[in-house]
Curated annotation (Swiss-Prot):
One GO MF term: structural molecule activity
Alphabetized HAMAP family for the sequence: Rota_VP6
Localization, UniProt: Virion
Spans traversing the lipid bilayer: none
Protein name as it appears in the record: Intermediate capsid protein VP6
Major subcellular site: virion
Key word Transport present: no
Superkingdom assignment: Viruses
A GO biological process held by the record: fusion of virus membrane with host plasma membrane
GO cellular component: viral envelope; viral intermediate capsid
Keywords: Capsid protein, Intermediate capsid protein, Virion
Length: 391
């Protein structure tokens, strides 16, 4: 963890240095940036460390970070020296990440054990517990140093499918006397088709990974002309569908936001809804019923629907998408910072830059969620994420 904290601190210092401007008068806060920067070169300028380069070869890295004279006005040359100095330190830290990341570990370690990396951390003597990228903060959460961070998650839903088939005797050749609910969802989107070959409510639940709040958008989409119906027993059937979304009323489509088995909030009709903290979303849908059939709202292809012999069956399809969803961060959730960490992983920390690495797909999501050599995978992901917070 102390290498992560050192990277956090140096990244924050880099942002402060880049926040200055040459040939302008410095206020008190900006002069403190000079002092904080000079503290590093005074300890590490000219020192050399043997660490792994991008092809996993131990290479001598020498820090070139000149000390800047204190002044109320910083020159262009001094500014360039500061900028190149902090970049030199970050380059060495990148090599330290490759070196430390190559060492397997089974538990979260508070101190670095790799000798050359330990020497670098001790020389820099600069640490910060938190990073701007939430992935880098997970070790501090696991060790109870900080509370779990509230993040905007990109994948609140478990990947799942639904194939819910209910039927009565005398199944029709076109899906009559069958109620079929077919669909799938993952990440933050899902698509479901509900075919009503008989008067019966479609009811199913979408599980969230953890208690989450946010916004959900639900919209009807054109339904398929013909679908395969996977029967629980016997040969599969097919359903010839007719889209009846034009006759759907708000009460025909209900969404229950639930905390376990308790209903927290209910909305009716498609649209955009803000939902409270919940871990389940239950849909209750009735595309067609006897009342609509008696009111002659169907077409000629829906004659004898109640008897199960109609040429076509009423159906609707809809898509739902969760947006701006917030929850407590953990290893299962992908936040908006994950692509930035992945970019750094693909450029400076590719798989060949480690002398030893876990046997998983080389991407941030696989490292965070792997059950194989879990702590080692997570350590590498957090180290890369801490470095990825740099400008």
């Amino acid at each position: 963890m102390d290498l992560i904290e050192t990277v956090n601190a140096c990244v924050k210092l880099q942002k402060r240095v880049l926040g200055l401007a040459p040939n302008t008068n410095l206020n008190t806060a900006e002069q403190s940036v000079l002092n904080d920067y000079n503290a590093l070169p005074s300890r590490v300028n000219g020192k050399t460390y043997a660490l792994l380069n991008q092809i996993a070869v131990y290479t001598p890295y020498t820090i070139n970070a000149p000390i800047i004279s204190l002044a109320v006005r910083i020159s262009t040359d001094d500014y360039d020296d500061m900028r190149s100095g902090i970049e030199s330190i970050l380059d060495v830290l990148a090599a330290a990440i490759r070196t430390e990341g190559s060492r397997p570990t089974r538990v979260i370690e508070r101190r670095v054990l790799e000798q050359n990396v330990k020497q670098l951390v001790d020389d820099l003597r600069l640490k910060s517990l938190i990073s701007d990228l939430s992935i880098a903060n997970l070790a501090a959460v696991d060790t109870a140093m900080i509370q779990p961070e509230v993040i905007e998650t990109e994948n609140p839903l478990y990947a799942d499918i639904i194939e819910q088939i209910v039927h009565r005797p005398n199944i029709g050749m076109n899906g009559g006397n069958i109620r079929a609910t077919l669909g799938r969802w993952s990440g933050n989107k899902g698509v479901v088709t509900c075919m009503s070959g008989m008067d019966s409510e479609h009811r199913f639940t979408v599980e969230l990974k953890t208690r989450t709040c946010g916004i959900i958008n639900i919209v009807y989409i054109p339904t398929a002309g013909t679908i395969l119906i996977p029967m629980p027993a016997g040969r599969n059937r097919e359903g010839d569908l007719i889209d009846v979304s034009a006759e759907m009323m708000a009460d025909d489509f209900a969404i229950d936001f639930m905390d376990d088995d308790k209903i927290i909030q209910t909305e009716t009709g498609v649209g955009v809804y803000s939902f409270p903290m919940c871990n389940r979303i239950r849909f209750r849908i009735n595309p067609w019923n006897t009342q609509k059939d008696d009111d002659n709202l169907g077409t000629v292809h829906m004659i004898n629907w109640a008897q199960g012999t109609a040429p076509k069956q009423p159906a609707i399809s809809f898509m739902f998408e969760t947006r701006r969803t917030f929850t407590e961060g953990n290893y299962q959730h992908l936040s908006r910072c994950a692509p930035k960490a992945q970019y750094m992983m693909d450029t400076q920390f590719n798989d060949v830059s480690f002398t030893n690495r876990p046997a998983v797909d080389w991407n941030i999501q696989s490292l965070l969620t792997s059950n194989t050599q879990r702590v080692w995978c997570q350590k590498i992901a957090m180290l890369i994420a801490a470095f990825a917070a740099k400008i």
